[in-house]
Amino acid sequence: MPQLVESCGIFFFCFILYCLCFSLPLQKIKIVIMRVLIVNTSERAGGAAVAANRLMDALNNNGVKAKMLVRDKVSDDITVVGVQRSLRSQWNFLWERWCIFWHLHFSRKNLFGIDIANIGFDITSLPEFKEADVIHLHWINQGMLSLKNIRKIINSGKPVVWTMHDMWPASSICHLTLGCHHYTNGC
């Protein structure tokens, strides 16, 4: 008989606990959704853009709110946001290319194989950046982000993930090293 009372007591306790847990109003349950901002120069052009789009789709289909911030927006996709390009930003891009062209002694051979990242957009003041929990950098060259902008993103305190689609993040100048290892001790 004492075992029956004890069993009934445990059952009653579990029943009360069950009722309390499942009778809570839904307004008191807060679900937090992670927000990821994927940053890439182009929305569609290049392998990095393809990878960034696939990642964004996978995240959005699995309970994460992901947006992509690009310099070159071509679609009307609402999850892709283009930075505001101005005449000045286009001039800055051309000026950076001219400096590289001059340094290469007017050879077009490696004009787009090198990036000095002197110019770019400050994305830290954008609402998409402020809302994001995680910043994921992809291919961010040719006027998307400068070295100064990258430092500002890192100093924002948000976690930063950087997918290296080429050697630029390691070499700080060349997209492809082509057997050259000068970046390891100075170029």
Model-derived features: positions:
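Glycine-centered signal
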Residues: 2, 23-26, 31
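Hydrophobic alpha-helical signal peptides and transmembrane signal-/tail-anchor segments
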Residues: 9-25
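Secretory pathway export signals and precursors
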Residues: 4, 15-17, 176, 183
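Intrinsically disordered, low-complexity segments enriched in serine/proline and basic residues
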Residues: 1-10
